[in-house]
């Protein structure tokens, strides 16, 4: 009997520095993650199907499912769009906001770290990123999946209740038909004893 093998989690790594990008890619693959790397925030948004100047997706729902990114890890200091700007774009998007985002930076600046965490970042790693940091990623992915599963269940339940409440006429109709049938039967039973009389020989 064949055993189903679970697909590895897919991480999108964003960093304008080639050496840093190669390092994070190697660490992620060593930790059994599927990895896609890009060198800018705008390319990350393009890969995710989002304009870098709009909140609306440019891809269809099936395209989004094919991308299937489970987590985004991005450098903070990048030319053009910073990691913080990318984080804000993701959290402002209705269909990307639940993807966990991890920020990386060489600078240990508390105000920067707090700002990213307040904006919705799940972790803030100081560079150089270590292999031990990779173990912190999976819990965020699993938490996001549980949340997504719960939201899907709530959506299905809401649709089911909506469908049930939109069809009361059919139930009332059948109930009314049944009531009328009982009334006719009762009337017939009252009439029968008076109309059928015994014959005298």
UniProtKB/Swiss-Prot annotation:
SUPFAM superfamilies linked to this entry: CheY-like (SSF52172)
Q: Quote the cellular component terms of the Gene Ontology held in the record.
A: nucleus
Which CDD domains does UniProt cross-reference here?
REC_typeA_ARR (cd17581)
- What triggers its expression? By cytokinin in roots and shoots.
The gene designation is RR10
Posttranslational modification: Two-component system major event consists of a His-to-Asp phosphorelay between a sensor histidine kinase (HK) and a response regulator (RR). In plants, the His-to-Asp phosphorelay involves an additional intermediate named Histidine-containing phosphotransfer protein (HPt). This multistep phosphorelay consists of a His-Asp-His-Asp sequential transfer of a phosphate group between first a His and an Asp of the HK protein, followed by the transfer to a conserved His of the HPt protein and finally the transfer to an Asp in the receiver domain of the RR protein.
Annotated organism of origin: Oryza sativa subsp. japonica (Rice)
What keywords does the record list, in alphabetical order? Answer: Cytokinin signaling pathway, Nucleus, Phosphoprotein, Transcription, Transcription regulation, Two-component regulatory system
Q: Tell me the protein's name.
A: Two-component response regulator ORR10
Q: What happens when the gene is disrupted?
A: Dwarf, viviparous, lesion mimic and sterility phenotypes.
Q: Which residues carry this modification: 4-aspartylphosphate?
A: 75
Main subcellular location:
nucleus
Taken from the record, one Pfam family name reads: Response_reg
